[in-house]
């Protein structure tokens, strides 16, 4: 069947993520430490990772909502250090905003915009991501006809939910959709299991 729709993963497919996330994480943590000095010692241990795991264990669906999860990690740690709920929520909101600002300081892989522009002339383009990047904020939304994230769907690839939403939005059958992504399980296996075609693309490997 002819390909009519091409969907893309975002992180590590259209841009490298690791260094950006590390820098964003450091900026948020530095802010919290400037407001509550005792948080610095906590953040230098595995406490943050432990809280992350505890929150997911309590509500497994939160793994799909990364912004909410990060906010609650900040809030939990701050309250454990004696901050009131109101104080913790205020600081957590500010820290999350700092993180998200840093998270969007991204540089596309070479040639990405040229490829998207060429593909848009022939195919319906979409985004299927497990992350929380905002393509409008990044200034690349004009290349895409639709975008679905794990936060929006409350589910993550390799579940079929993302791919079914693409079919629903475009009114196309799975075999007419080709998904491109860097992750062999989430992107390739997820797409194939949903009946779509898949291309594994990993600029870093």
What is each residue range found by the language model?
Residues 1-6, 18-19, 34, 86-88, ...:
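Asp-based, Mg2+/Mn2+-dependent phosphohydrolase catalytic module
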Residues 2-110:
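N-terminal helical cap/lid subdomain that shapes the substrate entry/recognition surface
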């Amino acid at each position: 069947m002819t390909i009519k729709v091409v969907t893309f993963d975002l992180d590590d497919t259209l841009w490298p993520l690791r260094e950006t996330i590390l820098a964003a994480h450091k900026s948020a943590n530095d802010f919290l430490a400037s407001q509550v000095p005792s948080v610095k010692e906590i953040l230098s241990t595995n406490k943050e990772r432990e809280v992350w795991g505890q929150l997911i264990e309590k509500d497994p669906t939160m793994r799909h909502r990364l912004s909410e999860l990060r906010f609650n990690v900040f809030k939990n740690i701050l309250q454990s250090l004696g901050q009131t709920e109101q104080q913790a929520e205020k600081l957590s909101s500010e820290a999350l905003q700092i993180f998200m600002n840093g998270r969007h300081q991204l540089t596309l892989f070479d040639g990405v915009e040229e490829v998207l522009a060429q593909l848009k002339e022939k195919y319906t383009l979409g985004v299927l991501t497990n992350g929380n990047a905002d393509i409008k904020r990044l200034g690349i939304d004009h290349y895409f006809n639709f975008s679905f994230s794990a936060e929006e769907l409350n589910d993550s690839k390799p579940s079929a939910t993302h791919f079914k939403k693409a079919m629903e939005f475009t009114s196309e059958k799975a075999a007419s959709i080709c998904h491109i992504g860097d992750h062999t399980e989430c992107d390739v296996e997820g797409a194939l299991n949903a009946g779509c075609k898949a291309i594994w693309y990993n600029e870093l490997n």
